Each structure stands twice: as structure tokens, then as C-alpha cells.
Amino acid sequence: MEKFGPMIREIRLAKGMTLNELAKDIVSVPFLSKYERGASDISAENFFQLLDRLNVRLSEFEALNANLKQETQDSFLEKYSYAANNDNLILLNQLLADEKQYYQQSANIRHLHNQIILKQYINNMTHLPYSQEDSKVIKEYLLQVEDWHLYEIELFGNSIFFLPLATTEFLVKTAIKKTYLLDRISNNKHVLAQVIANVITKMIEADELMKARQLIELGKRQLTHTKFYYEKTYLHFFEGYCLLKEGKELGENYCQQAIDVMKMLKDYETANHLTAYLDEHGFKL
């Protein structure tokens, strides 16, 4: 962690704190001075104590540290999302080359997982079959992890498109079981809710309406006592869609209510997407 010392110094000076004020009861002043020059390492415990004394959250520190940001998973996901949404094959291949290099340098398994996601998406874009071996790597990793954290939730969410439906169904239930200890972390629960919504969409596309309805109910329970209005509205829409597929008029009301909520919140892009989804599947409101 010695490379973060100079950034700690910048934050300290920006907050008008002296070395003595920051170091008090955490580390010695000479040690802190040495650490801030990048000449010494520091324990994780002391590093977090310094951040706490500075009143800076780890997420804020990551955003402030340009060098660190280049290597974060958030940075990769941001670039991947942009490339995928724009069908930018050149950028996808560049990201793939970068992830191969990062993996060679660090042996961090996330860079291997990122390569798999990229290769599978490129296969999809170029009309090639998904690699079953690569799918197996993701599946086995997720199954052997005892407790899922944000990384595992996001990995699963970004792998849904190439995993077999049966695997996806099993893993979403695994995700719910293995993240219960992290329910108090709002962002993890929020991301999990989005993942559940994506699995529901996949089940509906496969015409597995009963399984989709079961997962909708599971998703609704997950969202109890939360303010995740987008996800709640999204589930309401697809509950309505399932009812429409079953020939029940109530489904039209549910879908219209969900779209009206999106319009009221000025989320016209999602409202248009949901309306187009109905049109594509033979339903008009």
C-alpha cells in the first residue's frame, strides 16, 4: 500500500491537517512522513484508520486516486458497458488485450473472468457459439465461493447472457442464499435486485413463465423495506407481462402502471424500452 502514501498526503494537506493530527494514536509521526513519501508500506488496519481520521471513504479514495482507478473492476465494467452498448468490437478487443496483460502481471483471477466475459460477448456479436469451457469456469468459481460479495454478484450479472438457463436459475438462488450476510450493505442488495430482474427477463424470453413468476415473488421479498423503486417497478412490469402471456387482462394494467411510473419519474428511455418490449412481443397498450 506504499503507493497510496502520496495521495494520503495530498488529502491531509487539503484538509489542513498536520502530520501530528493524522498520526495520533495510529502510527508514529516519522513513520507517517515516510509512508507519505512512498518510502514505506503500511498495514491494512492502519491504512483504514488513516482514512477514517481523514473522513474519507474507501470509495472516495478510489475515485481520487487516478492510478488506482485504472486498475479497478469498476473502471473495467464502465468501459465494457460502453463498448457493449455501442457494439464497439474494436474497443472490446482492446479491453481483452488489456485484461490478458493485467492477468499476466498480477495473476488476479478477476482479469481471467473479465477475459471470459469479453470473449463470450465478442462471440455473440460475431455469431459464434459460446465457449462451454469458459462458461464452466465462471460456474465453478461462483459455486465454490462460500460467501458472495459485490464482485461475485456483478460477475454473475455480467455472465447471465451466456450461461445456460438451468445454471442461471440455480445460481440466482445461490446468490440470494450466499449474500444474506451482506443485506446491510445497500449497494450489494441493489445490484442483486438488478441481477434478479435480468434473470427474470431471461426466463421470460425462454417462455418459462412459471419459473419467472416464482423468481418475481422472490425478488419482491428481497426488495421489502427498500427504496429501490426502479427495481420494484421493473418487477411490476414483468409480473404484468406474465399475466398478459397467460391471457389475463390484469397484466395490461400492471404494465401500464409500471410505464406510467417511469414517465412520472422522467425516465423516458426505460418507459420507451418497456413499451417497445411489449410491441415486439405482440402486445399494445
Report the location of each language-model feature.
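DNA major-groove recognition helix of helix-turn-helix/homeodomain DNA-binding modules
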Residues: 45-60
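A short, Lys/Arg-rich alpha-helix, primarily the initiator
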Residues: 1-14
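Short, charged recognition helix plus adjacent turn
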Residues: 64-90, 260
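TPR-repeat structural position
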Residues: 89, 165, 209, 248-249
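Mid-protein regulatory/catalytic core that forms ligand/cofactor-binding pockets
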Residues: 101-208
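Short alpha-helical DNA-recognition segment
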Residues: 16-33
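Amphipathic alpha-helical segments of tetratricopeptide repeats
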Residues: 96-101, 137-143, 176-183, 216-227, ...
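"A position-specific structural signal for the A-helix of alpha-solenoid helical repeats
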Residues: 7, 78, 112-121, 154-158, ...
